[in-house]
C-alpha cells in the first residue's frame, strides 16, 4: 500500500542548507602564522635538522594538529617552500614589470632580495633555495622540480628585463637576454 502525501503541493517545504557543525574544539592556531614559523625553522636548519618536536614547539601545535593541518614533515616543508617562493615573487613582480632603466630595476630587484635574505626575527635568514632547498632537491624529485621551476621563472623574468633594455637601447643589440639572465 502506497501512502499519499497529505500535504498540498502549494505548502511544500523548502530545505535551507545548513553548514555542518565542526566537531571538536576550534582551531587554536592560524595556519599562515604556523606556516611562517615552520618556514623560519626550515630556513635556519634545513629539512633534516628540523625535527617534528622543533616544529611543534615553534608553531605551538602538537604533532596530531601539525599532521592534520599540513600533512607530514615533507609536505610541511614543501608548503613552506611554496610560501617562500610566493612571498619572494610578490615582492619582486612589480619591479620586473616596471619599465625603468635596467640599472635602476636591477638595483631595486637586488635590494628587495637582500631585504628578504637579511630580514628575520632571529637575524639574517639567507636564501631558502640556496641554503636548504637545493640540498633537499638532490634526494627529492618533487623538491627538485620546484627548485628548477622557480629558477626558470626567475631566469625568464630577468631575460624579459634584459630584452626590454636591449629594445630601449640600454644594452647592445648583440646582447643575449637569456645568457645575461643566467
Segments (PLM) and residue ranges:
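Amphipathic alpha-helical segments used for helix-helix packing
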Residues: 105-106, 120-142
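An amphipathic alpha-helix signature
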Residues: 35, 89, 107, 155, ...
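Hydrophobic alpha-helical connector segments
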Residues: 79, 93-125, 177-181
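N-terminal intrinsically disordered/low-complexity leader segments
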Residues: 1-29, 173-174
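Short, basic, alpha-helical segments at the C-terminal edge of helix-turn-helix-like DNA-binding modules
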Residues: 82-88
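Hydrophobic alpha-helical segments that form the core
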Residues: 4-6, 125-134, 157, 174-182
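Amphipathic alpha-helical packing segments from all-alpha helical-bundle domains
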Residues: 104-108, 141-167
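Helix-turn-helix
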Residues: 2-4, 33, 37, 41-75, ...
